[in-house]
Amino acid sequence: MRRIECVAIVATFLGLNYVGVAMAQEKKPDAKPASLLTPEEGKHLQNVRQLTFGGQNAEGYFSIDDKQIIFQHQGEGVPCDQIYTIDVDTTDRKPAVPKLVSTGKGRTTCSYIFPSNGRILFSSTHAASAECPPKPDYSRGYVWPIYDTYRIYTAKSDGSDLKLLTDAPGYNAEATITRDGKHIVFTSTRNGDLDIYTMDADGKNVKQLTHELGYDGGPFWSYDGKKIVYRAEHPKTDTEIADYKDLLAKGLIRPGNLEIWVMNADGSGKHQVTHNGAANFAPFWHPDGKRIIFASNMADPKNGRDFDLYIINEDGTGQERITFHPDFDGFPMFTSDGKRLVWASNRNGTQPHETNLFLAEWVE
């Protein structure tokens, strides 16, 4: 698995505004839909279309009207993730050209689109430095960086009128918005541990929802705003606790047995959904409010690098595998009507580890 900072796996391309992206789009023609799916994937995915071409593109999330996707990308000439938007459908059926909406400085992650006020949301390190933050030290194994310079910002949909939303010390990222636009859920180390918080859309009325030692993060609201799905790993033994605290003090975590959890919007009713001991992440609700789609490497216990999409009932029953490609698939999100699915995948890449966004019709 690659770097997954926020719900993350990516980095982004900058270029001059979106010229670099346009060039990347022109490098590759539309692939035939049938070539983008394995035979097993045809049960739930049809008429798949590749949306981005080249670099690393991930965390693609629909606007509330499903007409746009906001995502992060890193590519040739750009060392750090930046945030872009792209039209889902174009009149000429050609790939749309992504538009840069973040500052082009520092590293950005975890973007989302407000439902009604023409603004976007993302986290960035640019206030601390215009340069990329340092890469993590992998001498202690595979770790994720938790940059304490991440702050949450809002901006107009074109990237102008940038406003700081959170200025608490520590890591502040992984933010998503309720469909009524009134509340934000996010992950922060402001109290010394990686916990989930909510706040109003203006940054006020901050409430801590999780309190158990360990990583609680990657939260997403249910469609009715009454529940939150998230990923968590809570160390149990003295050795695990010591290792977790030592790494966190260095701005790192070691992703291991991440499980999917659900809680009510006020933090009550926490319950574990998956129990497979694998790395499960990027959970998102199906519009029916009963099922959760997520990414996991449970089918690759030996190497742990092959992540696929699964769907499961909130009570942990009825789990079904959705993707079968022999590499990474992650960051799934349904359209509001549940008829289409966007996700990030290594399939059809022209370079090793290339990650692109794909859109498919969802079949029950």
Report residues per predicted region:
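Predominantly a core beta-strand signature of beta-propeller blades
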Residues: 47-50, 95-99, 142, 160-163, ...
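Residue-level detector of Asp-centered blade-edge/turn motifs that repeat once per structural unit
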Residues: 64-65, 115-116, 179-180, 223-224, ...
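Short loop/turn segments that connect beta-strands within beta-propeller blades
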Residues: 88-91, 156-160, 200-204, 264-268, ...
